[in-house]
Amino acid sequence: MDISRLRNFSIIAHIDHGKSTLADRLLEFTGALSQREMQNQFLDKMDLERERGITIKAQTVRLTYRADDGNDYVLNLIDTPGHVDFTYEVSRSLAACEGGLLVVDASQGVEAQTLANVYLALDINLEVFPVLNKIDLPAADPERVIQEIEEIIGIDAHDAVLASAKEGIGTHEILEEIVKKIPPPKGDASAPLRALLFDSWYDQYQGVIILVRIFDGTLKKGDRIQLMATRSSFEALKVGVFAPTMVETQQLAAGEVGFVIAGIKEVADAKVGDTVTLQHRPCSSALEGFKEVKPMVFSGLYPIDTVQYEQLRDALAKLKLNDSSFSYDPETSLALGFGFRCGFLGLLHMEIIQERLEREFGLDLITTAPTVVYRVHRVTGEVQSIESANQMPELQHVEYLEEPFILAHIHVPNEFVGGVLALCEDKRGVQREIKYLTQNRVMIIYELPLNEIVLDFYDRLKSITKGYASLDYEHLDYRKSDLVRMNVMINGEVVDALSLILHRDKAYYRGRDLVSKMKELIPRQMFEVAIQAAIGNKIIARETVKAMRKDVLAKCYGGDITRKRKLLEKQKEGKKRMKNVGNVELPQDAFLAILKVE
């Protein structure tokens, strides 16, 4: 295989800008798929990816294309996830390429996620060229979008390809540009093997399948390979390429992209970003850029029906096989029974995992409010990381608390700026800058505490801007904050599943909203139920659910007041006794209400 005829590229685009459809057109045009095999969004293998129109795992496909100069080229398309939670996966997929297509919707212009991924690509010196998609739409305005790309991203866009993936316009021009503009890979096939592992997933028959991009050396079937970060070694049982279905080959040489099946049992052993080398002839240094991905958002998952606990455990273990960035530990709650504390990269990641559990494994789950990782500095000087309110020590042992901050880039149309600024201020944000990108698009940059974002920030941002805003964020650092733990008590008993860690300024309002919401949801009992929100020993809000009572005076017509009083006193005594022994069943909705309180 002549290395000068190879091209490795990826497609960078915001959600819904037509990336997967464009990939379909490229597959069709180069004859990788016949009309019969063609299905929309071929590369998005999971139903959920297809349904939400997002790419979650990276996929690769090898296309052969005869260019106008008469030569045959091999093009490796590496499809990247386009969502903010999966930034690390994107950066590894991009590191496996020499160039990228920047796909921008000709009617919507540049969005926040596009920017984040383009900057990742430009940071590692990829050759990026723009493609304007959806030019068949009546609202398409290529002139404006070209100007936007040049002003915001700073790459030359005057000769951008105009295309419509849906109609198949411009596919040939895109392939020609890939051949002309993207440089061939560099690499020495005789050097020791150095390959980047940029994705892995679990197959129930063959174990873990890893995707690699070979930078130096050659990987043959039967070689013993070593993964440098985990120091584990395996035998390469099969090597090959996706064209777009799996095709086995004898070897993969420098510059090529392909898969390796090596009998690896768990995805945790094949970490994304790791360097693959040969055991008997290892390379001198690993490829740079590897990092351990740490969960940032935590939430408790409990089965509604306790019988499903075992099923939930098996389901989580299966998902973990495929997704090493997700973590789970068993935990118990007095109110909810047995469940798991799960860690996710971000909100979208959390939603996807929950949906997959409910859809693929048929589980009914209840989810506690998401929290982030706080740092507790104790009086003794030790620092402890906590991810749920129940782990927080008593206040007298705590010197101060720190919470994680993020830097958010929000793109909005001009008319919504006021509403978005008000939302960010309400969420304790610190304004960095406001940039007018064009006459009607604004980029707002804010520093925000992560725990304000995990609850409902994204939903509220979308509703304020009628769905036009796009958000991208990166993690900054930990900062000292006045955080407290708020407990919810029912008849004096603390309900552990409802405890929250939040900022002292917000505790009073949040507590008041919470107890009034709970009052609506808890059914009336035969005795009165007190619902209280407390910080330490101080009660900050209270509501009472009145008792149901029988009319004990119904049978007294007229008669003496003392007789009536005796009956009422007797009833009161009974209610008191009942309150001591009675316990309140909390309905399922009560926990969901916590998530919904604005």
From Swiss-Prot:
InterPro entries the UniProt entry points to: EF-4, EFG_III/V, EFG_V-like, EFTu-like_2, G_TR_CS, LepA_C_sf, LepA_CTD, LepA_IV
Predominant place of localization: membrane
Gene3D superfamilies referenced in this protein's UniProt entry, alphabetically: 3.30.70.240, Elongation factor 4, C-terminal domain (3.30.70.2570), Elongation Factor G (Translational Gtpase), domain 3 (3.30.70.870), P-loop containing nucleotide triphosphate hydrolases (3.40.50.300), Translation factors (2.40.30.10)
Organism domain of life: Bacteria
Gene Ontology annotations for the cellular component aspect, listed alphabetically: plasma membrane
Domain tr-type G as annotated: residue spans: 4-186
Places the protein is found: Cell inner membrane
Any GO MF annotation of the entry: ribosome binding
E.C. designation(s): 3.6.5.n1
Topology versus the membrane: Peripheral membrane protein
PROSITE patterns according to UniProt: G_TR_1, G_TR_2
Keywords (A to Z) from UniProt: Cell inner membrane, Cell membrane, GTP-binding, Hydrolase, Membrane, Nucleotide-binding, Protein biosynthesis
A biological process from GO: positive regulation of translation
Ligand binding (GTP): D16, H17, G18, K19, S20, T21, N133, K134, I135, D136
UniProt cross-references to Pfam families, sorted A to Z: EFG_C, GTP_EFTU, GTP_EFTU_D2, LepA_C
CDD domains recorded: EF4_II, EF4_III, LepA, lepA_C
Catalytic activity: GTP + H2O = GDP + phosphate + H(+)
HAMAP family the record matches: LepA (MF_00071)
Family named by the database record: Belongs to the TRAFAC class translation factor GTPase superfamily. Classic translation factor GTPase family. LepA subfamily.
UniProt function note: Required for accurate and efficient protein synthesis under certain stress conditions. May act as a fidelity factor of the translation reaction, by catalyzing a one-codon backward translocation of tRNAs on improperly translocated ribosomes. Back-translocation proceeds from a post-translocation (POST) complex to a pre-translocation (PRE) complex, thus giving elongation factor G a second chance to translocate the tRNAs correctly. Binds to ribosomes in a GTP-dependent manner.
NCBIfam families registered for this protein in UniProt: lepA, small_GTP
Name of the protein: Elongation factor 4
Species of provenance: Pelobacter propionicus (strain DSM 2379 / NBRC 103807 / OttBd1)
